[in-house]
């Protein structure tokens, strides 16, 4: 039975699927403009994709920009994500820098949720999860497959592995090569929901997988990602259109 997670009065893992909007900006000026553009959009969680920053190699600058996001949206749950190149992100970096950055963000207590890549070394991942939770920050463990959709059993196994590492939220994103692959992801989501004790987040990327971003409440995915001003992953739907569609699916349509 999945337990829910409450972050700034937002309940993750129960009720309607929550909408996260990624913040994608290269510098302070663009970040300020994007924050102004998204502030009135109908989203539940803001995800700061710090790997898109030109200054992503400076921990101090990343902290400064994260503070800007926190100050601009004080009442929204803040998910900090630094996606590395190997998992589809914009910034290639060493494990040492990656975990040093995560530790700095955790110690700052600026984010409410922190994204940690599952396959970054089990010991380091477990330490980061424990450190986050010690500082009152939820740990979201994640994995991304940008070239394929693993079999259902493997998807479920990876989500279970995240939970075993102590994750508060378990997330996987896969790339479909066919409509059947989308069904595989949805079936895995349903199975994982039955087994998981923590909220799960799943998506099939690209245009083919877009339906998975709308079906979370039915199959068990707790968060869906919708674009504000710029997509951070293939197949993201605009936040306003995503909210309208989710409302329609929940309430029924004439």
Curated annotation (Swiss-Prot):
Protein keywords: Amino-acid biosynthesis, Aromatic amino acid biosynthesis, Lyase, Schiff base
Catalytic residues (positions): 144 (proton donor/acceptor), 171 (schiff-base intermediate with substrate)
Biological process annotations from GO: 3,4-dihydroxybenzoate biosynthetic process; amino acid biosynthetic process; aromatic amino acid family biosynthetic process; chorismate biosynthetic process
Coiled-coil region(s): none
Pathway the protein contributes to: Metabolic intermediate biosynthesis; chorismate biosynthesis; chorismate from D-erythrose 4-phosphate and phosphoenolpyruvate: step 3/7
GO MF annotation: an example: 3-dehydroquinate dehydratase activity
E.C. number(s) listed in UniProt: 4.2.1.10
Residues annotated to bind 3-dehydroquinate: 47-49, 83, 213, 232, 236
InterPro entries the record matches: Aldolase_TIM, DHquinase_I, Type-I_3-dehydroquinase
The reaction(s) this protein catalyses: 3-dehydroquinate = 3-dehydroshikimate + H2O
Pfam families to which the protein is assigned, alphabetical: DHquinase_I
Superkingdom of this protein's organism: Bacteria
Chain's role: Involved in the third step of the chorismate pathway, which leads to the biosynthesis of aromatic amino acids. Catalyzes the cis-dehydration of 3-dehydroquinate (DHQ) and introduces the first double bond of the aromatic ring to yield 3-dehydroshikimate.
UniProt cross-references to NCBIfam families, sorted A to Z: aroD
Assembly with partners or alone: Homodimer.
Family: Belongs to the type-I 3-dehydroquinase family.
Protein name: 3-dehydroquinate dehydratase
Organism, scientific name: Neisseria meningitidis serogroup A / serotype 4A (strain DSM 15465 / Z2491)
Lineage: Bacteria, Pseudomonadati, Pseudomonadota, Betaproteobacteria, Neisseriales
